[in-house]
Every structure is written in structure tokens, then in C-alpha cells.
């Protein structure tokens, strides 16, 4: 029995969990958020300037509700908390901020992780970069924000738990640049961070991610490669794939790009685990980027020129049509040909109920890691190059 459920996807929709449920939630959020459009324009028109401390001390670290890295002492590392949105109890979610302020002036970079709560390798990558920095030898500033979605990280789950409508989960990486007067806590949290912490302190930015629970991805960078400043940075990473795509509105790196700040998204393997080998590649690439911008001195490490980089601008999802156990016939990074069988599925009797093939040639960039699947779940994504990319599509989580 042959099933070829293929639907071309030209945006970063690697992490589908429940299309119907998430789509309904997104529609509700959009409808509710429309009422706040006028207030959103006033709160996000100009990024905040100047550092504001709340007077609180948490675990020995000062708490800020706005940050300007120019106010910090040069030649030091600074550790503080940024005050995010309130919880239902009235307390605030705090976000960890580390700033390495060089002794000499220079460019400012923002490194972000923890936008999704199950993406551990992204956090470790940023921590490793920051641990290697010596402010006494730097020109410029590197600011790391490692746990953007604190409530999601507490449960090591992808989405932000929202209690406003009973039980709901919100993907904050569809909310940027956020709205300080938005319809959900996640939207307000994003607005506070973007307006008062991230945007005011960035000349360029990197938002680190991984695959999601139940769906693994390989090492790649998602970037708008037609932007010269972004292309120059992405090519400094010794990783094997580049997804040259603008993605869609609502993701953090696009919010940066929309206000003139070059940004992109590295993807670092599987969720919930630390892939130290893969992390080292992205640390090396990020250090190359800091050298490229003159923040650090010294020779570059390995770059994309030292590895065989496959560049695609579209991803083909292969979706399950049956429920059952999934057996993959290819691995991440494998090259596939048009018509090649990539997976089969068995029911509870062990009978093969579906076979899945790729309709085009490319490389495997993502695979379902959960052994069982219901109809509609993505089983694999094939990265490929489309001669004429489509534009303007958006896809629910």
C-alpha cells in the first residue's frame, strides 16, 4: 500500500504538533489582539532607552525592567535579571541576562536561547560562547538572554502555558515583536523583552533553537541569504545545511530583521538533550561571527568553506496518513532521490499500512523521533532548492 502525502512547505514549519488545535488558538489570539492594535503602536514605536532597575535583588542579582548596555561598566561581565510579564499570582517572570562589556567600543550582539522551553542545546551553546569571552580583550558588547520563555522551560515543554482561557499553550516564537498591551501573557512578555531589552542593545542578533520534542532536526541555519550582512555571518558556520528562507512573521529573528537588525536562527539538533558535538560547531561559528565583526581578535576557525554545505530554499513535509509505528529508511542529512522510499508505517498487528516516498531530490533535514504517529504528523522534511520560491505563505504550528 503506497501513500505519498506530500505538501510543499516554504516556511519554517518543522515543529507541527497539532495543526488544528494550534491554528484555532492562533486565530483566537489574532482576533483578540486586533483590539489592542492602537495601543501596540504606541508601546512599540520606539525602543526604550536607558537602564531602569526595579530595586529588587533576586539570588544576589539586580533586576532591571529596561537595559541599555552602554550604561554598564566596560571590561567586566555583568549578570542580572530582566523583569518580564506578571504571572497570575502577580509575581513576575524573570529572564537571565549576561553581558560581556568590552574595554573598547564596538558592535553590540545579542545571543538568544530558550524561546522554546524544550531546546536545551540552544541554551548550552550560548552559555559556552559567553564562558569563552574575556571582556578585557573585547571591543564591543555581547549580551546573552538564555531563558526567554521561563514558564515553558520550567516544564521543559515547547510552548508557553497560558491560563487566560483555561488550558492553552502558546508558541511565543509566533508572537514577536510582541505587544506590551497584548491579549496574552506571552505576547506581552515578548513585547517587554523586544522593546526594552533585545532591540535597544543589538546591532545584530542570533536566535538559537533546536528541533522539538518528538521531532529531530539536523544542524542547519535558517536565514535570509539574500541579505548580504546575514549571508556573511551564516557562511562562517561549519555546519552542513542552510535553509535559505525568509520564514514568516512572528519569529524572533524576523522581528529583528524588520527593524533593520541583521539576524538569523541556528538549529542545533534534537530537543531535550545536549548534543555536545553539534554544539561545538555552533560555538565555533559564533566565535567566527564575533571575530568577523571585530568584537574579538584572532584568526577564524572552520567555516562553511571547510564542510560540504547543502543549501535549500524550501522544505517538503512528508505527513503521516495512518496511525501506527514509524520506521525510517533514511537518516538526517541523507541525500534522497525523487521516488525514494523514506519511511514505512505498521499497525498494531505489524502489518505495513503505509509507505512514504519523496517526490523530489534533496537532503533530509528533519525526522519524527517519536516511534508512533497519528495521521497528519510530519514524518520527515526534505530540504531542496526550488527555482522559483513561493512567497507570503504562513503555516499554523
Where are these regions (language model features)?
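Structured catalytic-domain cores with a bias toward divalent-metal coordination
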Residues: 3, 7-22, 38-397
Amino acid at each position: 500500500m503506497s501513500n505519498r502525502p506530500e505538501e510543499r512547505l516554504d516556511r519554517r514549519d518543522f515543529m507541527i504538533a497539532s495543526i488544528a488545535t494550534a491554528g484555532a488558538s492562533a486565530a483566537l489570539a489574532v482576533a483578540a489582539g486586533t483590539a489592542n492594535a492602537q495601543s501596540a503602536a504606541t508601546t512599540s514605536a520606539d525602543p526604550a532607552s536607558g537602564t531602569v532597575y526595579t530595586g529588587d535583588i533576586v539570588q544576589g542579582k539586580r533586576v532591571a525592567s529596561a537595559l541599555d548596555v552602554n550604561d554598564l561598566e566596560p571590561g567586566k561581565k555583568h549578570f542580572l535579571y530582566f523583569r518580564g510579564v506578571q504571572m497570575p499570582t502577580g509575581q513576575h517572570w524573570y529572564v537571565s541576562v549576561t553581558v560581556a562589556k568590552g574595554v573598547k567600543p564596538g558592535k553590540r550582539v545579542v545571543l538568544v536561547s530558550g524561546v522554546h522551553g524544550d531546546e536545551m542545546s540552544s541554551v548550552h551553546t550560548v552559555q559556552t560562547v559567553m564562558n569563552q569571552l574575556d571582556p578585557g580583550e573585547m571591543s564591543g558588547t555581547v549580551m546573552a538572554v538564555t531563558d526567554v520563555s521561563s514558564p515553558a522551560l520550567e516544564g521543559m515543554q515547547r510552548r508557553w502555558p497560558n491560563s487566560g482561557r483555561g488550558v492553552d499553550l502558546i508558541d511565543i516564537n509566533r508572537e514577536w515583536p510582541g505587544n506590551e498591551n497584548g491579549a496574552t501573557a506571552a505576547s506581552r512578555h515578548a513585547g517587554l523583552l523586544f522593546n526594552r531589552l533585545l532591540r535597544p542593545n543589538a546591532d545584530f542578533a542570533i536566535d538559537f533553537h533546536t528541533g522539538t520534542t518528538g521531532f529531530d532536526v539536523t544542524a542547519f541555519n535558517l536565514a535570509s541569504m539574500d541579505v548580504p550582512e546575514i549571508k556573511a555571518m551564516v557562511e562562517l558556520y561549519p555546519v552542513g545545511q542552510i535553509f535559505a528562507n525568509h520564514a514568516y512573521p512572528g519569529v524572533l529573528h524576523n522581528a529583528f530583521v524588520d527593524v533593520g537588525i541583521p539576524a538569523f536562527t541556528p538549529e542545533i539538533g534534537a530537543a531535550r538533550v545536549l548534543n555536545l558535538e553539534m554544539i561545538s560547531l555552533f560555538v565555533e561559528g559564533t566565535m567566527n561571527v564575533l571575530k568577523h565583526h571585530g568584537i574579538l581578535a584572532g584568526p577564524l576557525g572552520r567555516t562553511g568553506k571547510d564542510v560540504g554545505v547543502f543549501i535549500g530554499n524550501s522544505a517538503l513535509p512528508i505527513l503521516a496518513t495512518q496511525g501506527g509505528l514509524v520506521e525510517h529508511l533514511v537518516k538526517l542529512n541523507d541525500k534522497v532521490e525523487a521516488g525514494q522510499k523514506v519511511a514505512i508505517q505498521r499497525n498494531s498487528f505489524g502489518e505495513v499500512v503505509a509507505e512514504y516516498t519523496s517526490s523530489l531530490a534533496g537532503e533530509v533535514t528533519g525526522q519524527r523521533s517519536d516511534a508512533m504517529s497519528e495521521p497528519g504528523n510530519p514524518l520527515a522534511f526534505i530540504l531542496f532548492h526550488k527555482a522559483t520560491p513561493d512567497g507570503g505563505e504562513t503555516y499554523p504550528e
